Amino acid sequence: MELSPMATPGFLRVDFLTTVKAEAGDLQLEADPEHGGVHYRAPQEVDASKTDYFFPVAKPLPHKDLDYPWVGMNYTLGEKSYGVVQIDAPTNPRGTRWSAYRDYARFGAYPRAALKKGETLSLKYRFLISQGAIVSTELIQAEQATFTGVKPEPVTVTKLKAEGAGTPKAKK
């Protein structure tokens, strides 16, 4: 993982890289996107009523769509708000499902893959974390181009209110 401040104060770039190896036998990465993959999770004390998600498509269906190039989220913690964007790398497996709808401010990508014993899979994601609202679409696309080496097409960004799943309760 590599952390680097961005040019503007109050922003942080996190590049996440991991490699999975099928050591004991064949490995199938297939579960639900709620409980697998690479996620950002805000602290438990988040104000669930103020969580919003941003998608780079005109009519997002977050429970069904695959392979978003990125997803963004705004959340509030105490009196402060934060924005987070997760950018997917084109080298990651296609068919990636996203969990990006929970009101407790947790979202992320879950790629599906099958590995034979001894094979490896490398996954790369870039997170853009900001104080206040998420960064501009122009900055997201510039970061996406730098991270992936591919100039993205213009997008229509759609904001969706988080679904009211409620903040998970601590187990007794």
Would you name each region that the model predicts?
Residues 170-172:
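Short, solvent-exposed mixed-charge patches
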Residues 1-31:
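Acidic, contiguous internal or C-terminal segments within carbohydrate-active enzymes
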Residues 84-168:
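Beta-strand-rich recognition/accessory modules
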Residues 8-10, 22-23, 47-49, 128-130:
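Cell-envelope and extracellular/periplasmic
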Residues 2, 17-21, 39-41, 124-128:
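Residue-level recognition of well-ordered beta-strand positions that form the cores
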Residues 33-117:
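Trp/Gly-enriched beta-strand surface patches
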Residues 27, 49, 132-136:
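Intrinsically disordered, low-complexity acidic/polar segments
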Residues 11-15, 35, 120-122:
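A general secondary-structure signal for short beta-strands and their flanking turns/coil
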